[in-house]
């Protein structure tokens, strides 16, 4: 990937110089040393939150996130996007939760990553205290604990 981007950069400047530009006013100022990965992987969750689902209301909603790119609607974060489909006591948080497309762009930022981390940590603590599993703390008890620290789950609560 890095070599390909360097090759493209060299080709771009060859073309510009062939069109008459000179090195006096046309040159790369900075060349990235690392590939810019926004997302490399995500879990296959019990629910994949797609852009088509992002306007839905979910019974297992554990938080809300907004569209920070353009003014837009507030979306619900279902608990199932934090739970890997085939693992019992594992929670995901941050950029690796089960989302895709535009929803990935909306959830990859620090506020949503931090929120999902707090939710996953709270769920793990509740499961440990109750001797339960990740799916076992969905709904009631988890939402009750999150509401205690002022989480909102549905748009009409705003």
Provide a role label for each language-model segment.
Residues 1-158:
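Flavin (FAD/FMN)-binding glycine-rich loop and adjacent Rossmann-like elements that form
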